[in-house]
Amino acid sequence: MDNCLGVSRYIPRMYQGIHYLRGVAAAAVILKHASHPGGPWERALDAGVDLFFVISGFVMVVSTYGKDIGPLDFVRRRCERVLPMWWITLAIVALLGLGTGDWSAWVLSLALIPTVINSGVGSVYWGVGWTLVFEMIFYAFFAIGLAWRSTGFVFVVLPAMVAVGFAAGRSDVPLLNDTMHPLLLEFIMGALVARLVLAVARPSLLYAGLGVALLAIGAQFAGGTEVRPLTLGLPMALVVAGLAAAELPKIRFLALLGDSSYSMYLLHYIPILLAWSIIPRDSYWAVTFALAIGVGIAGHIFMERPLMALLRSCRTLAATAKPI
């Protein structure tokens, strides 16, 4: 397949830095929710979500580069990766009575369809799922690009959608609101970083240092989600650019955090909310932070990992099965 990226040469076999950054992103979000420090510190921790978005754009380009991947196969793999753990989380949250909304909101959340707009973005039954809505929107446009055999499709269409949102005004329909939201530009930033890494192999670590410096500056400015691509997304894109292909040592705990990042993100607010039913909100944040990390890691080991292994086995069985 024509990669349509205009890059070639060198593709590292393992992006260790990206893997570590996944864990860092999840830990930042958890620390923010456990402590709510307010001010610049809270906005800096918010950047964990922006880092996730940048990483997603990066990974989608790199993982499909030079491969003949059809749109349906791409969507299936993405849904298998995202939805099963999300459904398990929704079930747990509903049983514990921790979600927001009625049964119809829960049902729509199974398909990651937001029902209300909260803080400028579409919201679902379990609060952290708002980011997955953006992920799915990006995947949908990326899959269309694959159908057209051009991953460059997203570089044109997503910015155009955001421009339409600015020109015409934001929609009151939550899903349409998100489809034109500036946060989608962070996925494009990650995709552009992937082009850079694939083209020049090893961008300088100075990019990461510059990204941290810009984050310190951007965190000083309060603003809605519309300005986050500039104040938080751009710094995170530079961090990803600096660390994506860097040769980093194997650090077991960071690798474990990277492996567990999705479960950590989905599950972390459950132990935090349960703890707050016993202790004052935002108190003993170091304890609730550690508890949430532990629950996320346990969720990865005992739920996510076996589930992914089962899905792989089913795919293998389906691929090898022959009609009688």
Where are these regions (language model features)?
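Alpha-helical transmembrane segments in multi-pass integral membrane proteins
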Residues: 2-20, 27-45, 61-73, 115-121, ...
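Membrane-interface helix-loop-helix regions
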Residues: 55, 61-65, 76, 82-140, ...
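Functionalized membrane-embedded alpha-helices
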Residues: 22, 79-82, 295, 302
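Membrane-embedded alpha-helical segments of multi-pass transporters/permeases
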Residues: 90, 94-98, 143, 293, ...
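Structural preference for long, well-ordered alpha-helical segments in enzyme cores
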Residues: 24-27, 78, 140-141, 299
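Structured binding elements
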Residues: 52
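Loop-to-transmembrane-helix entry motif
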Residues: 78, 82, 86, 260-267
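Short alpha-helix carrying the canonical HExxH Zn2+-binding catalytic motif
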Residues: 20-21, 129, 133-134, 267
